[in-house]
Amino acid sequence: MIALIQRVSEAAVRVDGEVVGEIEQGLLVLLGVEKGDDEAKAKRLMERVTTYRVFGDEDDKMNLNVKQVEGKVLVVSQFTLPADTKKGTRAGFSRGAHPEDAERLYNYFSDQCESVLPTERGRFAADMKVSLVNDGPVTFWLQV
């Protein structure tokens, strides 16, 4: 399971022109679910995402996590993250989880985030338009 996290000052996701999720300061989490992923991996990844120190302290060092700055999380499913891009000019998607499994684990991950801090989410498998202001920019790839 993969989370591409971005520290944002604002982010929103729209489906058919309607805002379905929106946050101010916090983390935009693009979540990719791979074959073999399960609830235990989703919970471990949620714990890493919500405790990963990406926000500046009083000395402007990245020592604070999203909970410590009272930020929010916006979780967006991203089936392209597990893609195989090592060869050729077209990605291979065989490493991604089956859509039903991916949706279940996406919802589980989002619910776990929601249990510890304010969480918004995109709409699984929808054609989404994601807008964000990346603060820094600060972007990390987390994988379990």
From Swiss-Prot:
Q: What is the protein's major site of localization?
A: cytoplasm
Q: Which reaction does it catalyse?
A: glycyl-tRNA(Ala) + H2O = tRNA(Ala) + glycine + H(+); a D-aminoacyl-tRNA + H2O = a tRNA + a D-alpha-amino acid + H(+)
EC number of the protein:
3.1.1.96
Which InterPro entries does this chain map to?
A: Daa-tRNA_deacyls_DTD, DTD-like_sf
Q: Which residues cross the membrane?
A: none
Indicate yes or no for the key word Glycoprotein.
no
Q: Where in the cell is it found?
A: Cytoplasm
Which keywords annotate this record? Cytoplasm, Hydrolase, RNA-binding, tRNA-binding
Q: Which domain of life is it from?
A: Bacteria
Tell me its family. Answer: Belongs to the DTD family.
Q: According to its UniProt entry, what is the function of this protein?
A: An aminoacyl-tRNA editing enzyme that deacylates mischarged D-aminoacyl-tRNAs. Also deacylates mischarged glycyl-tRNA(Ala), protecting cells against glycine mischarging by AlaRS. Acts via tRNA-based rather than protein-based catalysis; rejects L-amino acids rather than detecting D-amino acids in the active site. By recycling D-aminoacyl-tRNA to D-amino acids and free tRNA molecules, this enzyme counteracts the toxicity associated with the formation of D-aminoacyl-tRNA entities in vivo and helps enforce protein L-homochirality.
Subunit-structure text: Homodimer.
Q: Which NCBIfam families match?
A: D-aminoacyl-tRNA deacylase
Give the comment on domains.
Answer: A Gly-cisPro motif from one monomer fits into the active site of the other monomer to allow specific chiral rejection of L-amino acids.
The protein in question is named: D-aminoacyl-tRNA deacylase
